[in-house]
């Protein structure tokens, strides 16, 4: 469980933030500022402690649905919505901070960006980065969002945008909602197929990366396909 310390002698979080800066506040205090008020049973600091004590880590916030958050904290719909909005805003800030504006250098560089973007998705997403001859991103394209009837994508869909963008190379990324990053037999077949199709058109498939919310698998780093 997430460890919480509650010190009743501390000044209220807003005053501490003004005096010491946001970086000096605990997670409990920062959450209390977002909650603003407690409920009938708990003071706002107690309520934030209660919520955090039910999490293994702060990353669990992102995986919780609006209904789960509202039920767990007993904070009502409005506060739950505000927390979810804050989480999404933070995710977008992090994604922007990790945007690959220059050259793509390593698989881990791509994986970190896509773990933040796709790690918490409940459905399988397939994203392709199309690169120029200096490994700069021309376009980041979501090719499909998976359903029970369909898994991954056909090479023609991926190559259509490669030709449209006059891409020299590409990187394929998809997530495993289960959290297990080990590639399936279908993942291997798909990787071989897209790599072969790229070669037929003179386009380089640099990597196929599988991501979860906390880890990744790179076919270039760990398989013999590249």
From Swiss-Prot:
InterPro entries tied to this protein: MPN, RadC_JAB, RuvA_2-like, UPF0758, UPF0758_CS, UPF0758_N
Protein's organism: Streptococcus pyogenes serotype M1
Entries under Pfam families matching the protein: RadC, UPF0758_N
Family per record: Belongs to the UPF0758 family.
UniProt binding sites for Zn(2+): 174, 176, 187
GO biological process, one term: proteolysis
Residues covered by the MPN domain: 103-225
GO molecular function, one term: metal ion binding
NCBIfam families the UniProt entry points to: PRK00024.1, radc
Record's keyword annotation contains Protease: yes
Keywords, in A-Z order: Hydrolase, Metal-binding, Metalloprotease, Protease, Zinc
CDD domains, per database record: MPN_DUF2466
Protein name per Swiss-Prot or TrEMBL: UPF0758 protein SPy_1118/M5005_Spy0840
Segments carrying motif JAMM motif: 174-187
């Amino acid at each position: 469980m997430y460890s919480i310390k509650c010190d009743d002698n501390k000044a209220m979080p807003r005053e501490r933030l003004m005096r010491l800066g946001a970086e000096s506040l605990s997670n409990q205090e920062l959450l209390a500022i977002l909650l603003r008020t407690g409920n009938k049973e708990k003071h706002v600091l107690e309520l934030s402690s209660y919520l955090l004590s039910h999490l293994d880590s702060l990353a669990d916030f992102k995986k919780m649905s609006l209904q789960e958050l509202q039920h767990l904290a007993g904070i009502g719909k409005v506060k739950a919505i505000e927390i979810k909005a804050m989480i999404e805003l933070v995710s977008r800030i992090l994604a922007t901070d990790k945007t690959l504006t220059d050259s793509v250098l390593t698989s881990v560089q791509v994986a970190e960006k896509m773990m933040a973007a796709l790690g918490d998705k409940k459905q399988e997403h397939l994203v392709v980065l199309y690169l120029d001859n200096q490994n700069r991103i021309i376009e980041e394209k979501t090719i499909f969002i998976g359903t029970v009837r369909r898994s991954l994508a056909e090479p023609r869909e991926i190559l259509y945008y490669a030709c449209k963008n006059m891409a020299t190379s590409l990187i394929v990324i998809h997530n495993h909602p289960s959290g297990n990053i080990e590639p399936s037999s279908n993942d291997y077949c798909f990787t071989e197929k897209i790599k072969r199709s790229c070669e037929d058109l003179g386009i380089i498939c640099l990597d196929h990366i599988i991501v979860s919310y906390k880890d990744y698998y790179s076919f270039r780093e760990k398989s013999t396909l590249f």
